[in-house]
């Protein structure tokens, strides 16, 4: 499991180092996506254990769900290297974290902005989103841990972004 993987990574680490396991379905949580962070605990030079905690998926989604300045059609979200959601999309329930892991065929998110973010690029572009709607997109990589990058995208429909103000 990803819990066990974090333990195996964290157990041999020096004090102050952190192990991370990206989101995957986790059987003890009824196959809900789960991610873990772990670190060895030392008393002076003696390792006394490994502390592991589950990343709060709802808190990540709560932060990403802030819609200030995004108008009616805007949204922002995080996507993992597997193209599955790491926060819920606002406009389509298929693109929630839980649904994207349970049904990857419908929940995977592929678009040029996310592809660019996942290879380490930041920028702004006009592209089509998962609804096949033309959007103005700002994107960037989020370096979560060594070897783990999530793509972040904030977007709004081009029609709304360039609409005249009445």
Task: Set out the residue ranges of the language-model regions.
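Short loop/turn motifs at secondary-structure junctions and domain boundaries
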Residues: 26-33, 67-70, 118, 130-133
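Extracellular/periplasmic catalytic domains that process cell-envelope and extracellular macromolecules
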Residues: 12-13, 30, 43, 69-71, ...
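Solvent-exposed, extracytoplasmic
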Residues: 6-9, 23, 42-43, 50-99, ...
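Solvent-exposed loop/turn segments at secondary-structure junctions
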Residues: 26-28, 57-59, 160
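Extracytoplasmic/periplasmic ligand-binding sensor regions of membrane-associated signaling proteins
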Residues: 1-54, 128
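Extracellular/periplasmic juxtamembrane segments that couple receptor/chemosensory ectodomains to their
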Residues: 41-49, 81, 93, 101-166
């Amino acid at each position: 499991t990803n819990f066990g993987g974090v333990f195996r990574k964290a157990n041999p680490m020096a004090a102050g180092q952190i192990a991370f396991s990206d989101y995957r379905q986790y059987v003890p949580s009824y196959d809900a996506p789960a991610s873990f962070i772990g670190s060895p605990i030392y008393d002076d030079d003696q390792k006394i254990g490994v502390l592991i905690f589950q990343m709060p998926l709802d808190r990540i989604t709560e932060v990403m769900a802030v819609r200030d300045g995004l108008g009616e059609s805007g949204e922002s979200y995080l996507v993992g290297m597997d193209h599955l959601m790491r926060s819920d999309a606002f406009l389509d329930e298929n693109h929630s974290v839980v649904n994207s892991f349970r049904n990857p065929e419908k929940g995977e998110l592929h678009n040029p902005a996310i592809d660019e973010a996942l290879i380490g690029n930041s920028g702004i572009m006009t592209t089509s989103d998962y609804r096949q709607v033309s959007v103005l997109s700002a994107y960037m990589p989020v370096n979560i841990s060594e070897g783990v990058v999530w793509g972040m995208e904030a977007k709004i429909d081009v029609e709304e972004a360039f609409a005249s103000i009445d």
